[in-house]
């Protein structure tokens, strides 16, 4: 009795669905987008790094580097202050031919500057650790972007006060809109340089 009820409900289910012909299957199969079955659709779509995502990551990398530079500069100043504050200095004696307070201040400033210069090393490691999955694609896009910059930048030998070079290394480019504006600026620079020759 139970199996006959299952058969009856399955017959009703299949009877309510329209019959599918081979021609209908062929026509729908050609219009459906294909993807590999090795990854789900959400993983495949998110693994491709677009140019806008690249510029966002590039801006984030720059911010991380500046932040780490400020952090390491403060760290360098604090470490040098901790060392120099424990030294016994005779205020009547000169150090390197200068007043001791001047030498201590210069040492603190120099260690802060050294810390600031070492900051991007720390920042790049933080960026690599935080974006490990996209790092290979980011590096490939960065190489491709730098090739575009090298191919499209202008000759800086004909610059003047009235015709400055537009961002020779492309460091200020942070979006596709800014890249297009940079291309327009390069074209205007080249046109103006030809007119004045």
From Swiss-Prot:
It is a multi-pass membrane protein. It is found in: Mitochondrion inner membrane. This is Presequence translocated-associated motor subunit PAM17, mitochondrial. Its main location: mitochondrion. Belongs to the PAM17 family. Present with 3000 molecules/cell in log phase SD medium. GO terms for biological process: intracellular protein transport; protein import into mitochondrial matrix. It comes from the Eukaryota. It comes from Saccharomyces cerevisiae (strain ATCC 204508 / S288c) (Baker's yeast).
């Amino acid at each position: 009795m139970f199996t006959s009820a299952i058969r009856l409900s399955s017959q009703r289910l299949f009877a309510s669905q329209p019959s599918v012909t081979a021609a209908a299957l062929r026509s729908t199969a050609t219009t459906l987008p294909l993807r590999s079955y090795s990854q789900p659709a959400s993983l495949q779509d998110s693994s491709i790094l677009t140019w806008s995502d690249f510029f966002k990551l590039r801006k984030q990398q720059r911010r991380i580097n500046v932040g780490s530079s400020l952090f390491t500069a403060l760290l360098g100043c604090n470490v040098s202050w901790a060392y120099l504050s424990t030294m016994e200095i005779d205020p009547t004696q000169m150090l390197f031919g200068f007043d001791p307070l001047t030498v201590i201040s210069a040492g603190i400033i120099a260690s802060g500057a050294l810390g600031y210069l070492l900051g991007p090393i720390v920042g790049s490691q933080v960026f690599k650790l935080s974006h490990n999955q996209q790092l290979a694609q980011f590096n490939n896009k960065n190489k491709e972007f730098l090739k575009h910059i090298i191919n499209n930048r202008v000759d800086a030998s004909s610059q003047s006060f009235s015709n400055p070079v537009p961002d020779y290394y492309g460091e200020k480019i942070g979006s596709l809109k800014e890249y297009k504006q940079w291309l327009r600026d390069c074209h205007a620079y080249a046109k103006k340089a030809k007119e004045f020759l």
